[in-house]
C-alpha cells in the first residue's frame, strides 16, 4: 500500500529557534514537529526569509548583559540550523498575498508572509510568537506551539 502525500506544516522562526536553543519554552513541542518530519509524517515548510530570521535570533542570544549562548555555541547552532532540510518557498512569491493580511490583522509584514504561505498551501501555521498569535486570533489554521499535539 503506497503512503499518501505528506501533509505540509508551516513553521515560523519562533518555532525553529526552539529546535536550537534548549532554554526556550515548548521545546518539547517543537522537537515533536522535527520527529514527525523525520518520520515522514509531515513536511516542514517556511518562507525563505526564515533563513535570515533564525540566525538573527541566535546571534541576539549572544548579546546583552546575560548572554544565553557563547559565540561558538551560536555558530554551532546556526550550522545545525543550516543543515536542516526545511522546504522553503521564495518570499517574493508571497509578498502580494501577505499585504492584505498585514492590514486586516495588524501584524508585521514578515509574520504575514508565514500566514500567506500557510493559506496558499491549505496548511496549518504553527507559531510560538505570542504577540503575533494573539494579534491574529481568531485565525483558522494558526496553532499555538504549546497546544500542538
Tell me what each language-model feature is.
Residues 1-8, 115-149:
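Acidic, PIN/NYN-like endoribonuclease modules and their adjacent C-terminal/linker elements
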Residues 3-4, 83-126:
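Active-site neighborhoods of divalent-metal-dependent phosphate/nucleic-acid chemistry enzymes
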Residues 12, 111, 129:
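Acidic active-site catalytic centers that drive phospho-/nucleotidyl reactions
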Residues 15-16, 50, 93-94, 114, ...:
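Alpha-helix capping/helix-boundary segments
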Residues 40-41, 84, 121, 139:
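Structured helix-beta-strand junction loops
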Residues 53, 97, 134-135:
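Phosphate- and divalent-cation-binding pockets in alpha/beta enzyme and binding domains
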Residues 55-85:
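Active-site-proximal, substrate-binding regions of enzyme catalytic domains
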Amino acid at each position: 500500500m503506497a503512503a499518501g502525500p505528506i501533509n505540509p506544516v508551516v513553521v515560523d522562526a519562533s518555532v525553529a529557534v526552539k529546535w536550537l536553543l534548549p532554554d526556550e519554552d515548548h521545546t518539547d513541542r517543537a522537537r515533536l514537529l522535527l520527529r514527525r518530519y523525520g518520520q515522514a509524517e509531515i513536511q516542514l515548510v517556511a518562507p525563505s526569509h526564515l533563513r535570515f530570521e533564525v540566525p538573527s535570533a541566535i546571534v541576539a542570544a549572544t548579546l546583552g548583559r546575560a548572554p544565553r549562548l557563547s559565540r561558538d555555541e551560536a555558530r554551532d547552532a546556526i550550522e545545525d540550523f543550516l543543515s536542516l532540510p526545511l522546504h522553503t518557498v521564495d518570499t517574493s512569491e508571497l509578498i502580494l498575498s501577505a499585504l492584505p493580511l498585514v492590514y486586516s490583522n495588524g501584524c508585521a509584514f514578515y509574520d504575514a508572509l508565514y500566514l500567506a504561505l500557510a493559506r496558499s498551501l491549505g496548511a496549518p501555521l504553527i507559531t510560538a510568537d505570542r504577540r503575533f498569535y494573539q494579534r491574529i486570533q481568531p485565525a483558522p489554521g494558526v496553532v499555538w506551539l504549546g497546544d500542538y499535539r
